[in-house]
């Protein structure tokens, strides 16, 4: 038997987590802004954490067996994470997606050989989430040994981030954390990480970054194009009282934020990261200079080449927001 060093993992799943943190000196020179690079997980996003945590918990407790057929509604990243882990574990998986999934994400999911169900009809809010959930319910009623991941209501979702990135953040940042800024969709990441951070930094302010037109915090629903941030339903795992501030960012602003991050820091990240950059820019106009801000960069930019990094898409979003061309 070949002896392996501690740096050699037995499985790709062992490389989930322990993502690096970087300080964004160029973008925010008057504040200490630390970003956790969650896009450096093996599946390319922070969704590797709940996918691994939920599946391994299910296997441990006998809820998931070799005959189980996993089912989940996803805008892309969780689907990729589940597909990766299902392939490693030898499990069947069906991902329910909609037309707003990025073409790259859809290709990646299909490359793993899992089943893909594409819904076509938008829901009452103009999105597809409720339509996807209806399709999930239909599949649960017809597929034998089906197991729904159910990320919007599954307490294991936020727990994965509490024990994962949340713990890693408090182990890395030793100075007091004044603000934790995170995007929301299922709200699992902001709930889990903030709860862990508050245990060590009780005075931290929790700032949620939501999409304009998302209903999570009561905004009026409008058509949204950017996947991975916002929702057309309020997640069951959200506790609104734990959020101190909400900043809404539209699709056009998000794209500009992504491009600015590349220009200043050389970081090529996904759409919700652009929303985070815009939100932090707004936040620092009203807080003390030198404050410590911690955030997360959820996924990779190469999954959005047809969206936020497309000049055609950018012009479309610019026109939709009524921004006049210079």
UniProtKB/Swiss-Prot annotation:
PROSITE patterns: CYS_SYNTHASE
Function: Catalyzes the synthesis of N-((2S)-2-amino-2-carboxyethyl)-L-glutamate (ACEGA) from O-phospho-L-serine and L-glutamate.
Keyword Acetylation: no
Family: Belongs to the cysteine synthase/cystathionine beta-synthase family. SbnA subfamily.
InterPro entries, sorted: Cys_Synth/Cystath_Beta-Synth, P-phosphate_BS, SbnA, TrpB-like_PALP, TrpB-like_PALP_sf
Entry-annotated residues carrying N6-(pyridoxal phosphate)lysine: 47
Species of provenance: Staphylococcus aureus (strain bovine RF122 / ET3-1)
Assembly and binders: Homodimer.
Gene3D superfamilies assigned: 3.40.50.1100
Pfam families referenced in this protein's UniProt entry, alphabetically: PALP
Cofactor(s) annotated in UniProt: pyridoxal 5'-phosphate
Pathway note: Siderophore biosynthesis
Residues engaged in binding pyridoxal 5'-phosphate: 77, 185-189, 272
CDD domains registered for this protein in UniProt: CBS_like
GO BP terms in the entry: cysteine biosynthetic process from serine
UniProt entry keywords in alphabetical sequence: Pyridoxal phosphate, Transferase
Catalytic reaction(s) noted: O-phospho-L-serine + L-glutamate = N-[(2S)-2-amino-2-carboxyethyl]-L-glutamate + phosphate + H(+)
Induction details: Up-regulated under iron-deficient growth conditions. Repressed by Fur under iron-rich growth conditions.
EC number: 2.5.1.140
Gene Ontology molecular function terms on file: transferase activity, transferring alkyl or aryl (other than methyl) groups
This protein's name: N-(2-amino-2-carboxyethyl)-L-glutamate synthase
């Amino acid at each position: 038997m070949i002896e392996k060093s501690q740096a050699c993992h037995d499985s790709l799943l062992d490389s989930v987590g322990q993502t690096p943190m970087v300080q964004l000196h160029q973008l925010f020179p008057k504040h200490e802004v630390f970003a956790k690079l969650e896009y450096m997980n093996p599946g390319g996003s922070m969704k590797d954490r709940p996918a691994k945590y939920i599946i391994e918990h299910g296997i441990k407790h006998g809820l998931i067996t070799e005959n189980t057929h996993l089912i989940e509604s996803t805008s892309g990243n969780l689907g990729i994470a589940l597909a990766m882990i299902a392939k490693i574990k030898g499990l069947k998986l069906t991902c329910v997606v909609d037309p707003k999934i990025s073409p790259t994400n859809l290709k990646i999911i299909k490359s793993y050989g899992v089943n893909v169900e594409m819904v076509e009809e938008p829901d009452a809010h103009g999105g597809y989430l409720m339509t996807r959930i209806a399709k999930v319910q239909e599949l649960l009623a017809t597929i034998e040994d089906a197991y729904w991941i159910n990320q919007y209501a599954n307490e294991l979702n936020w727990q994965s981030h509490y024990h994962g990135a949340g713990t890693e953040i408090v182990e890395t940042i030793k100075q007091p954390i004044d603000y934790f800024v995170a995007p929301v969709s299922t709200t699992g990441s902001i709930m889990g990480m903030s709860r862990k951070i508050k245990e060590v930094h009780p005075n931290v302010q929790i700032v949620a970054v939501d999409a304009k037109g998302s209903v999570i915090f009561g905004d009026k629903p409008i058509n949204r194009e950017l996947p991975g941030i916002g929702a057309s339903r309020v997640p069951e795992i959200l506790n609104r009282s734990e959020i101190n501030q909400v900043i809404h960012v539209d699709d056009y602003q998000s794209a500009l934020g992504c491009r600015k991050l590349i220009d200043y820091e050389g970081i090529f990240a996904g759409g919700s990261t652009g929303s985070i950059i815009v939100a932090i820019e707004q936040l620092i106009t009203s807080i003390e200079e030198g404050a410590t801000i911690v955030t997360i960069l959820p996924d990779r930019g190469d999954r959005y080449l047809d969206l936020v990094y497309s000049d055609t898409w950018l012009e479309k979003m610019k026109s939709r927001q009524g921004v006049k061309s210079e």
